[in-house]
Amino acid sequence: MHIIKTIKVLYKEIKILKKSNKKIGLVPTMGNLHDGHIKLILLAKKYSDIIIVSIFINPMQFDNLSDLKNYPKTFMKDSIILKKYHVDILFFPHINEIYPNGIEHQTFVEVIKLSKILEGQSRPGHFRGVTTIITKLFNFIQPDFAFFGEKDYQQLLIIKILVKELNYMIKIISLPTIRLKNGLALSSRNNYLSSQENEIAPYLYKIIKKTCEKIIKEDDNIRPKIIHESKILLIKKGFSVDIFDIYDYKNLEHPSKKVKKVILLASVWLGNTRLIDNKKIILNY
């Protein structure tokens, strides 16, 4: 595995790969790798000749400085994992390499509408940070494919819009959420959970599933009552609820009666840890 820390060296390597017509797959990460990342790498291998994984803890997408400071930095462990799965290139840049003039003077990229709602409303500037670093990585690496998990569904949708509207010739491929046996979605933030919170956390997806089952069975006018009861149940379990509702699968607007494909999005706090999850459903009208 070739570990690259500068854009200059990365450009040279990409130029060589492009000349040899190698298909490049990019898996962007912030490190602290788990089985979800590994599944993304394995998926990338099905499409790509060359696998590039980036590890960059992007300060631009953190709305909380203490969250940034406490984010796990596990480069040695991560690099061992990446070597084990035969990743070709690990791009591991320093912050000054990505933002040489500082974040406050950084030109940014933003998918305006979708970045301002839901998670974007709760975390101002977060998605601007995501789309700016993803744009930079796309420009540096020029991948044929880029791979993202579906757990961060709003982020996935934003990146798809970014690719379409900026005319990137990149295929975005998504991976269904990887879960523990108890249903908890894998996330680097799960490390923040206490032992007691780890016992409570799986209830989020259990309640999501039950809610979806009820929504499919019941009439449309009963839906607000179902959502409300599920929120109350989450609160009783110890969660603080930020987002818990169904949205149009394509644009995250509240669905009209004609929309059948919807997604239940959940964003909650458990102690000091933010957990997000979702489930797609097809409504019967």
From Swiss-Prot:
It holds the Pfam family Pantoate_ligase. GO terms for cellular component: cytosol. ATP binds at residues 30-37, 149-152, 178, 186-189. It is found in: Cytoplasm. The keyword Ligase applies. NCBIfam families: panC. PANTHER family: CYTIDYLATE KINASE/PANTOATE-BETA-ALANINE LIGASE (PTHR21299), PANTOATE--BETA-ALANINE LIGASE (PTHR21299:SF1). This is Pantothenate synthetase. The gene is panC.
